[in-house]
């Protein structure tokens, strides 16, 4: 399929909308009421610091809802307002936040059911409205919905669309797209659907394995087995790694994406020399500004004298996981939670580890005066952050009285 032509045709269709429906002002008031927080604004105004009793909260200077997420949520609310009686679906979670997705269900916005790992689009009627989430949808899903005659509301973040344009350029130049991301993540699935040949690497270690294969060759069968679920159909590492371009899932660690880009640039330079480098390597800046800002703010925050770190965001939120990784690499006691209810008591907190395991830690909140660092992922409303901070204040106040 000519994905570029298909996308252009879809965007000119009368059933396609990516600009909203003119209800922005009304929806903005509703979103402010449901998701914003006067406490969080107070902390911002106090140089991102608030002290109550024995607790000092230090808030990262960039956290929470990014522009792309705000836009996606606002468009979903607008869609419900514009189509008050129609059936509305979302191809996946609108964003990776449980409270926001619960709100979608309360608004009678349905999620496409998944059977045995596959989405069941048979539930979608020809006249239904379908929202594409902030991290996009695959070309195949868009084509299916277009053929059904559905009204498509596209909330894909422009930064994600920028990555799609990048892999289109790779394809035009007959370059294989090496995508830094998680092959199961919805954004990477969407991005790879726009690519020609592609290979998805999770981290620098996997990238180094590929670079070594390019330079020295390795066991071909081992390579194909290692990346069986992370490459395009019919991928041939002996042919398809002669010309490569770099792209990324926008929520990955900025520094690691940059390292991977430099690694492959050096690899192709070493193999083909400076004269032919541009024929064999392409790189465009596809690092999301919001992701970069939140990671940079986290790197600054963990340099402070903190007793512990709270990272708030959906457990399937990649950008939140990266924030947690930064904290743990610093050696801080750090707890990734998605909702305030994970904090059971002064003595018990349920949290997600980097390996995905949900564990309970006892005696997590130190006695006496403490400084708590707080940040949140790009899909986390300020109201959720407020709930967590108030819970910590309340727990410490109770122990102080006792």
Curated annotation (Swiss-Prot):
Cofactor field: [4Fe-4S] cluster
Entry keywords, A to Z: 4Fe-4S, Iron, Iron-sulfur, Isoprene biosynthesis, Metal-binding, Oxidoreductase
E.C. numbers: 1.17.7.4
Domain of life: Bacteria
Gene3D superfamilies associated with the record: 3.40.50.11270, 4-hydroxy-3-methylbut-2-enyl diphosphate reductase, catalytic domain (3.40.1010.20)
GO molecular function, one term: metal ion binding
A GO biological-process term: terpenoid biosynthetic process
Active site: 187
Cofactor: binding details: Binds 1 [4Fe-4S] cluster per subunit.
Binding site for (2E)-4-hydroxy-3-methylbut-2-enyl diphosphate: 96, 185, 250, 317-319, 379
Binding site for [4Fe-4S] cluster: 66, 157, 288
Biological pathway: Isoprenoid biosynthesis; dimethylallyl diphosphate biosynthesis; dimethylallyl diphosphate from (2E)-4-hydroxy-3-methylbutenyl diphosphate: step 1/1; Isoprenoid biosynthesis; isopentenyl diphosphate biosynthesis via DXP pathway; isopentenyl diphosphate from 1-deoxy-D-xylulose 5-phosphate: step 6/6
Family listed: Belongs to the IspH family.
Function: Catalyzes the conversion of 1-hydroxy-2-methyl-2-(E)-butenyl 4-diphosphate (HMBPP) into a mixture of isopentenyl diphosphate (IPP) and dimethylallyl diphosphate (DMAPP). Acts in the terminal step of the DOXP/MEP pathway for isoprenoid precursor biosynthesis.
Listed name of the protein: 4-hydroxy-3-methylbut-2-enyl diphosphate reductase
Species annotation: Trichormus variabilis (strain ATCC 29413 / PCC 7937)
Gene: ispH
């Amino acid at each position: 399929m000519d994905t570029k032509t298909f996308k252009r045709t879809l965007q000119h269709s009368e059933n396609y909308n990516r600009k909203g429906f003119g209800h922005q002002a009304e929806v903005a008031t509703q979103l402010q009421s449901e998701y914003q927080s006067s406490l969080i604004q107070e902390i911002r105004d106090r140089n991102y610091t608030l002290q109550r009793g024995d607790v000092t909260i230090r808030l990262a200077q960039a956290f929470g809802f990014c522009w792309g997420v705000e836009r996606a949520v606002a468009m979903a609310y607008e869609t419900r307002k514009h189509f008050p009686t129609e059936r509305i679906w979302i191809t996946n979670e609108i964003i990776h936040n449980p409270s926001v997705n619960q709100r979608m269900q309360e608004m009678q916005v349905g999620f496409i059911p998944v059977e045995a790992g596959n989405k069941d689009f048979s539930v979608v009627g020809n006249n239904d409205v379908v929202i594409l989430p902030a991290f996009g949808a695959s070309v195949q899903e868009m084509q299916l919905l277009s053929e059904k005659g559905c009204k498509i509301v596209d909330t894909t973040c422009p930064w994600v669309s920028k990555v799609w344009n990048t892999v289109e350029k790779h394809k035009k130049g007959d370059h294989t797209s090496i995508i830094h991301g998680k092959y199961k993540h919805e954004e990477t699935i969407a991005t790879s659907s726009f690519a020609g040949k592609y290979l998805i690497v999770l981290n620098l270690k996997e990238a180094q394995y590929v670079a070594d294969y390019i330079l020295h060759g390795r066991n071909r069968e081992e390579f194909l087995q290692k990346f069986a679920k992370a490459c395009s159909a019919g991928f041939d590492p002996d042919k398809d790694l002669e010309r490569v371009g770099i792209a990324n899932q926008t929520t990955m660690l900025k520094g690691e994406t940059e390292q991977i880009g430099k690694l492959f640039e050096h690899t192709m330079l070493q193999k083909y020399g400076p004269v032919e480098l541009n024929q064999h390597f392409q790189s465009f800046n596809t690092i999301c500004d919001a992701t970069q800002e939140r990671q940079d703010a986290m790197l600054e925050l963990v340099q402070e004298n903190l007793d512990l770190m709270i990272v708030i965001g959906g457990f399937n939120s990649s950008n939140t996981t990266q924030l947690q990784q930064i904290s743990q690499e610093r050696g801080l006691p750090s707890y990734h939670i998605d909702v305030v209810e994970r904090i059971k008591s002064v003595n018990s907190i349920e949290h997600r580890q980097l390996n995905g395991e949900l564990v309970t830690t006892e005696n997590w909140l130190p006695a006496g005066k403490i400084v708590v660092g707080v940040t949140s992922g790009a899909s986390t409303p300020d109201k959720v952050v407020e709930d967590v901070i108030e819970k910590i204040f309340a727990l410490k106040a109770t122990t102080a009285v006792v």
